[in-house]
Regions:
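A structural motif at transmembrane helix-loop-helix junctions in multipass membrane proteins
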Residues: 1-14, 22-23, 81-97
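Membrane-interfacial helix-loop-helix junctions in multi-pass membrane proteins
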Residues: 16-74, 82-89
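Junction motif at the cytosolic side of a transmembrane helix
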Residues: 69-118
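Acidic, glycine-enriched loop/beta-strand segments at the rims
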Residues: 124-130, 143-155, 168-171, 461, ...
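Histidine-rich, glycine-flanked metal-binding segment
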Residues: 148-190
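Metal-associated gating/positioning segment near the N- to mid-region
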Residues: 188-255, 271-276, 339, 363-365, ...
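Divalent metal-dependent hydrolysis catalytic cores, especially in the metallo-beta-lactamase
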Residues: 219-244, 258-266, 316-326, 354, ...
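Active-site neighborhoods of metal-dependent hydrolases
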Residues: 294-295, 299-336, 380-504
Length: 576
């Protein structure tokens, strides 16, 4: 019995710590979390936490229930095989082999979990719930609520991941609120920014490392870079379907930390239309597989409708179509037939999916508005959008997303410039090898194309002018960056877009509203985020200074809050 007691203690104590029964398993090193997957106690602890903290049922925790039953049955069986009435009684070697047989199910389960990391992800989500349950008061801070209102001094109480109260002026005693204090003197509190136009799979720069072009790795890092930069939500408008859905679901479950993602999935375009060039030069062995993830090229209205329904079934949040013929040398594309675009739009409305339409000139914009787009992406980069078309957009409530940053970035890229690389925020979020590779490529002159630089500079100038006219005409505005394209880095580009809007003549409050409340409405998440309003998720950005005096203050980030969790920004890139 003494030997048995010692053996039990040797096994029991590691199980107690590794299972998460004493400290959250998510706080353990990665190797320890993986080792814990071979212990049935890990699933029991995770299961009970899911039931108590997330109000889950037994079916939601089938793995934990199974682990408990298997442990009971096999443990009883093993005890019977190894039972001895007397200490001196010998156990036959054959019976000792039952120990290995009993451990086999746990070895198999552990190997699967070590590979899939499903239970590890659930542990991280539960730990995140714990972090988001804190109560704290941000006080003595300037508050922009998102809808244009500014409180020069006030406070926000965050509780259980939500905005519990908003105080205009003096705040209550934090001791009575049982709240920790976050001092906001000299700072401004904004709703978390939202980027309405991103390509998470694009690295935005040049690298010699293949992993920097692997969407399974670049997309999670892009979501982390967005959150690091105070962008708490984004709309993916042209990324691999499976990878983007997987990332969105992991972030929603709390098993991965990053900006919440709205997924449009593959882009609807013509057979040789814009978007297909990204897969044109891929090896034949993978070309069709990648193409199926990135684009849809319907040939008939029936096929277009079916493809929209399939995307809805897959779980997308929106749909994107491209209505663009291109311009200039080497940038001409087939334009998607209007009958097919109309079919996409009609089915998207039936499926309650917002439709974003990429446009290139005023004709494209007119067709997009007539067809019923929810948002016009880019607007016209080649000619002026007529006043009557802006009037119609205002009447129909069609959003304009001008994406000034990407037009400026291409103009610089083809001119042999890379001003974005000097941004402090860019240097913080972009891997060093991409910064170095991009700088080396630009300095080499290999990307220098003066004719294209001139075209994009004209496009940028036209887009700026149309933005100002659209605002004056009452067109609802949203803000996106087209990040993932060259020199348009995920996260920092949103702050640059704000600066470009203000430089174009847009009032700061209007620009900030486009980047928060309006974007939330477009993405269909306004009931959860996008504003500083009681009851919404606490997605917040605290910055040093006053953006209404200097819009670049949004880059001076003091604190990022996501669903109530105060983000440890430096740790966002630790997870591989």
């Amino acid at each position: 019995m003494q030997e048995a007691t010692i053996a039990i203690q040797i096994v029991y104590m590691p199980m107690l710590f590794l299972s998460g029964a004493t400290i959250p398993a998510a706080m353990l090193p990665g190797w320890a979390q993986t080792l814990a997957q071979f212990m049935p106690a890990s699933y029991l602890v995770t299961g009970f936490q899911g039931i108590f903290f997330r109000n889950q049922n037994l079916w939601d925790n089938a793995a934990a229930v199974g682990a408990l039953l298997v442990t009971m049955v096999l443990g009883t069986f093993l005890a019977m095989q190894l039972f001895r009435w007397e200490k001196e009684e010998k156990i036959r070697p054959r019976k000792k082999l039952w120990v290995l047989a009993v451990l086999a199910p746990f070895a198999i389960t552990g190997c699967y979990q070590a590979y899939s990391k499903e239970n590890i992800g659930k542990n991280e989500g539960l730990f995140r719930d714990l972090q988001r349950s804190e109560t704290y008061l941000i006080r003595n801070v300037r508050i922009f609520t998102g809808d244009g209102r500014v409180m020069e001094s006030g406070g926000v109480l965050v509780q259980n991941g939500k905005i519990a109260e908003i105080y205009d002026g003096a705040t209550p005693d934090p001791l009575k609120l049982k709240a920790e204090v976050v001092e906001g003197q000299g700072k401004t509190l904004l709703p978390g920014l939202i980027d309405a136009h991103v390509h998470l799979g694009g690295p935005a720069g040049i690298s010699s490392a293949p992993e920097d072009y692997d969407a399974q790795k670049t997309m999670p890092r892009a979501a982390a870079a967005l959150l690091y930069s105070g962008v708490t939500a984004a709309r993916s408008v042209g990324d691999g379907l499976d990878a983007s859905l997987k990332l969105r679901n992991a972030i929603d479950a709390g098993s991965r930390l990053g900006a919440r993602i709205s997924v449009c999935g593959p882009m609807f375009t013509a057979e040789n239309g814009h978007g297909t060039e990204f897969v044109e030069h891929l090896p034949a062995a993978i070309k069709e597989t990648v193409k199926a993830q990135l684009v849809r090229t319907p040939k008939t209205p029936e096929e277009a409708r079916r493809q929209v329904r399939e995307l809805k079934t897959a779980g997308v949040d929106c749909v994107k179509a491209i209505l663009e013929a291109g311009w200039g040398d080497g940038m001409l594309f087939d334009r998607l037939d209007l009958l097919l675009v109309r079919s996409v739009a009609e089915e998207a409305r039936t499926q309650h999916l917002p439709l974003a339409i990429h446009t290139g000139d005023a004709r494209d914009v007119a067709d997009a508005v007539e067809i019923g787009a929810s948002s016009v992406e880019h607007g016209s980069w080649r000619d002026e959008i007529p006043d009557r078309l802006f009037e119609r957009m205002a009447q129909q409530g069609v959003y304009l997303d001008p994406t000034l940053t990407v037009a400026e970035a291409y103009a610089q890229y083809f001119a042999g410039k890379a001003d974005a690389l000097s941004s402090s925020l860019v240097q913080q979020v972009v891997p060093a090898r991409i910064l170095q590779g991009t700088r080396a490529f630009v300095d080499s002159g290999k990307g220098l194309e003066p004719a294209k630089a001139e075209l994009f500079q004209k496009a940028f100038t036209q887009a700026r002018a149309d933005l100002l006219r659209a605002w004056k005409a009452g067109v609802p505005l949203v803000m996106g960056t087209d990040s993932g394209n060259p020199l348009v880095f995920h996260g920092p580009s949103m702050h640059h877009e704000l600066q470009l809007w203000v430089q174009a003549g847009i009032p700061v409050a209007v620009a900030l509203q486009a980047a928060t409340v309006n974007n939330a409405k477009l993405l269909g998440i306004a009931a959860r985020t996008g504003a500083i309003r009681k009851g919404l998720d606490a997605d917040l950005l605290l910055v040093d200074g006053n953006p209404f005096e200097d819009i670049s203050a949004t880059e001076r980030i003091s604190l990022v809050v996501f669903k109530g969790e105060r983000i440890h920004r430096a740790g966002l890139f630790d997870k591989k």
